[in-house]
Amino acid sequence: MDTIKIKFTGMGGNFDEKDNFITKILQERYVIRVEEDPDFLFYSVNSSDYLNYDCVRIFYTAENIVPDFNICDYAIGFHYLNFADRYIRYPLYLVDGFRAYAGDDYALNLQLALQKHVIEDDFLNRKTEFCSFVYSNAEAAECRRAMFDALSNYKRVNSAGRYLNNVGRPLENKLEFQKKHKFVIAFENTSTPGYTTEKIVHAFAAGAIPIYWGNPDIMREFNPESFINCHDFGLTEKGEQEIIAKIVEEVKRLDQDDKAYMEMLRTPAFTAENNVDMQRELFKKFLFHIFDQNIESAYRRNRFYWGERYERKQRIGNRFYWQCRKVIPIRDGIRKLFRRYK
């Protein structure tokens, strides 16, 4: 097998650059050496030091960020893009066992979601709670809080994340917690075509009906008869109350009609086009294509003149940004101090 020199940077969390979903695939075909002077760099959004590596760059994101192809040669992301051999869409929920961005096993959740429609007749008896809400990020679209408040006026919504926690204890196991509930509020932080994270899959895995908002094209991936799609009602980030009220009425209808509820549960989650095994094979093919080339042939970005000028501007901008980030905590500390002695 050929030997390849790689490195990862800016991936965030507890990412292990020697053992992750990318290295597991590459090890099927190559001998991997993780080195400081790589021939191929995988980078993400949590650092700007990728600009220090003059090698083939492969951008990966688990966030709602569009790749900058002036900086990277290849990219792995959420958006529905076509760019020759330089891009593949591989959303977060397909990343098996990738723990850098979540505390649970994606592989288990994905397999449960694929089989969520295979349930016994007494399945509904196991649902002891109405609806769950598990979030730690308060900086999200207004509609998420609006949905929580509106549904809470109908029945109690159990919030087990750091945001709006009303269960009085930290969450130990998200999957086991959500399994008790008939519904799950599965709202993304923002709404962008293609941006589908793990939230809807975790709801399916728990055997619950997702109340979903985020990717307006979600029906390209998941069966529209298997969940409540808030985009069908016209909900935007602002959380319009009259639209929220209509969604709540739909939740009430399903909550009060066991037959309709079970019919939705027994509908397969994934569309025929969203074949998980096929997407995995396409992802492998994408990676192997990059590394099967000799290094000079693998470059795609413009590395000369305008490409150099563009990258130089990025270096200056990134340096300023990261310096500002160092100052912000000091600024906030001074503000708190002045407020204390007012």
Question: How does the language model describe each region?
Answer:
Residues D2-T61, I65-Y163, G168-L171, L175-V184, ...:
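Pol beta-like nucleotidyltransferase catalytic core
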Residues N189:
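Flexible, polar/acidic helix-loop-strand segments at domain edges
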